[in-house]
Amino acid sequence: MANPHGDRYPPEAFPDADDLPPRVRRGRGNARLEAFIQIDGKPIGSITPARGDVWAQRAARRSFDLELWQADDVSNHVEMKAAVILVEGRGTHAQVILNHAPCGSEKYDPAGCDDYLPDFIPIGRSMTVLGTDARGNPFRRTYEGKAVR
């Protein structure tokens, strides 16, 4: 399915995908990255990858606490922030709908959220990310937590 910008998303990303900015395209002047978050089916609101907000700080702290040193580099990313919201809110499942795909999920990408999320999310909890990839195709992936805390 496509939103008003013509960006394609998985069907379960709607109606939120209709309200996202145009998809982020690497190497170009871009629209801002934005994500809508749900925890256990309850809408939480939208977040951006701002570096200085409280969720980025908490994600950096969690990376440190879990000794995921490389994950600190992406602590401002919306997926990492959503994972912190999930953990601190004692939820079991987060859904993130964003106008991109997680870093690290595309062929030839360096390590990123796609690699770190399973070790960042606690055992028994999960996150589904719905977005649109670099080629404009729908993206859907569920990350099952492996962290012991």
Residue ranges and their predicted role:
Residues 100-149:
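Active-site or metal-binding loop neighborhoods of secreted/extracellular toxin and effector enzymes
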Residues 36, 97, 130:
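Residues in well-ordered beta-strands of folded domains
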Residues 32, 93, 126:
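Exposed beta-strand and adjacent loop surfaces of beta-rich binding modules
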Residues 13-15, 74-76, 105-110:
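A short linear-motif detector with a strong N-terminal bias
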Residues 1-73:
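Glycine-rich short-loop/terminal segments
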Residues 59-102:
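Short HxH-centered metal-ligating active-site micro-motif
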